């Protein structure tokens, strides 16, 4: 399929695992006029390439993948560096050069490939990897290999968070800065060693595909957070722990809100322990929880998002007081990376955009798996554990958009809970 759809002026790069049939097909592609590079990533592949090229009478177009010591930090750091699944060490690269020289095929080696990692967040890691890759290029040219193409592999990040930071779901550089660093590293080595300037190709799959898809889902049900806006004052004969919780709520106007919240959390824990030991009845425990959640709402109203010491508690209360919103999709099918590695995706309401959201929510899918829940949400300053949404209106549909799911999500998603495929619309 790749050969059939390849443009005459395009290139096809064959990397990854290769068996004899794969290599034969790649050589046939070269024979019929395509620029098909077979990238040698294991020494055993070189034997197969030489055997099949002789059998078909086709001079191969070869590349070699070098394994860099430089790696980019993050969830995918071991896709590059010494622990990479693919690539040749320095000693193995020398063995490839000598074998090709002995077979009079050194002229066929035209591409050098390396992979710095995936979703590299810090531009300094790209700079380090490119310096090492540029040195490899100079050394291969010195050994007589006519390398004309440098394949810098993947690594170009996607800023899922919008924070322009070194967080693993972000990137602290632009696409232009990435390109400038790639070109600069190779230009410098070419200028220093008086080498020809190679063509540069990349395999920036995530950066090319992440933005191409959005998942749209409708809200099916909402489980409201515990809400007793104005609990009544406790009677004189109610347990002391309830009296303490009530006194804390009443003191909020005169005390720091964080202090009141910490006391309320302590007293609630004490009340739950007393219930476990039979000291409190179920009705008394429920009463304690009502006063506690009322305290939480009152404290949240007094916290300032711009005050640093309030941020952690504010995020905690937003999650604690969030509604559970059940959406018509499967997390495991449509957002598997969120479940597996805490990948963050931007999520926004698509309905009632002319209204300010007044509730906080945690999204749940409709599988029977308790892990079917979105735990991390992009906001204006990073990542939070709840999402601002509108209060539901009876009988009115409410849609949510989950953005930037175009890279790997659909292909990785499974048939968990026997959910069928999501309907697709191509625009």
Show where each model-derived region lies.
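Active-site-proximal beta-alpha core segment in soluble small-molecule metabolic enzymes
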Residues: 1-151, 156-161, 172-177, 185, ...
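Generic preference for well-ordered secondary structure
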Residues: 10, 33, 70, 77-80, ...
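Short, glycine-/Ser/Thr-/acidic-enriched flexible segments
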Residues: 17-19, 43-45, 67-69, 91-93, ...
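Short, low-complexity, polar/charged sequence segments that are solvent-exposed and flexible
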Residues: 31-33, 56-60, 81-85, 130-133, ...
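Short linear functional motifs in flexible/disordered or boundary regions
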Residues: 76, 124, 145, 162-164, ...
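Charged (often Lys/Glu-rich) extended helix/loop segments that serve as interaction or gating elements
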Residues: 181-183, 187-427
């Amino acid at each position: 399929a790749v050969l059939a759809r390849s443009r005459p002026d395009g290139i096809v790069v064959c990397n990854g695992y290769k068996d004899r049939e794969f290599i034969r097909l790649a050589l046939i592609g070269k024979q019929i006029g395509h620029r098909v590079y077979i990238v040698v990533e294991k020494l055993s592949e070189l034997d197969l390439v030489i055997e099949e090229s002789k059998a078909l009478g086709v001079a191969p177009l070869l590349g070699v993948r070098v394994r860099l010591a430089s790696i980019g930090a993050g969830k995918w750091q071991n896709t590059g560096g010494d622990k990479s699944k693919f690539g040749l060490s320095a000693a193995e690269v020398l063995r490839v050069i000598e074998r090709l020289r002995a077979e009079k095929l050194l002229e066929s080696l035209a591409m050098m490939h390396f992979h710095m990692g995936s979703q590299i967040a810090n531009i300094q890691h790209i700079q380090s990897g490119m310096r090492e890759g540029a040195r490899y290029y100079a050394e291969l040219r010195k050994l007589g290999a006519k390398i004309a193409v440098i394949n810098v592999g993947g690594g170009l990040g996607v800023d899922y968070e919008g924070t322009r930071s070194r967080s693993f779901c972000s990137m602290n550089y632009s696409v232009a800065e990435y390109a400038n660093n790639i070109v600069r590293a190779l230009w410098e080595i070419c200028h220093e060693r008086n080498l020809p300037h190679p063509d540069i190709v990349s395999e920036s799959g995530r950066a090319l595909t992440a933005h191409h898809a959005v998942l749209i889902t409708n809200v099916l049900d909402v489980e409201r957070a515990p809400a007793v806006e104005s609990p009544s004052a406790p009677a004189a004969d109610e347990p002391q722990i309830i009296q303490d919780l009530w006194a804390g709520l009443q003191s909020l106007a005169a005390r720091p809100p964080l202090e009141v919240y910490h006391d309320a959390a302590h007293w609630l824990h004490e009340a739950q322990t007393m219930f476990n030991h039979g000291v409190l009845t179920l009705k008394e425990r429920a009463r304690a929880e009502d006063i506690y959640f009322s305290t939480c709402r009152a404290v949240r109203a007094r916290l300032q998002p711009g005050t640093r010491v309030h941020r952690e508690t504010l995020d905690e209360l937003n999650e604690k007081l969030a509604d559970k919103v059940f959406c018509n999709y499967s997390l495991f099918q449509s957002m598997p990376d969120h479940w597996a590695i805490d990948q963050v995706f931007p999520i926004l309401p698509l309905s009632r955009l002319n209204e300010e959201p007044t509730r906080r929510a945690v999204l749940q899918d409709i599988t029977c798996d308790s892990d079917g829940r979105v735990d991390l949400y992009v906001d204006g300053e990073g990542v939070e554990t709840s999402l601002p949404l509108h209060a539901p209106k009876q009988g009115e549909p409410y849609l949510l958009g989950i953005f930037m799911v175009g890279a790997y999500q659909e292909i990785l998603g499974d048939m968990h809970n026997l959910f069928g495929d999501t309907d697709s619309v191509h625009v």
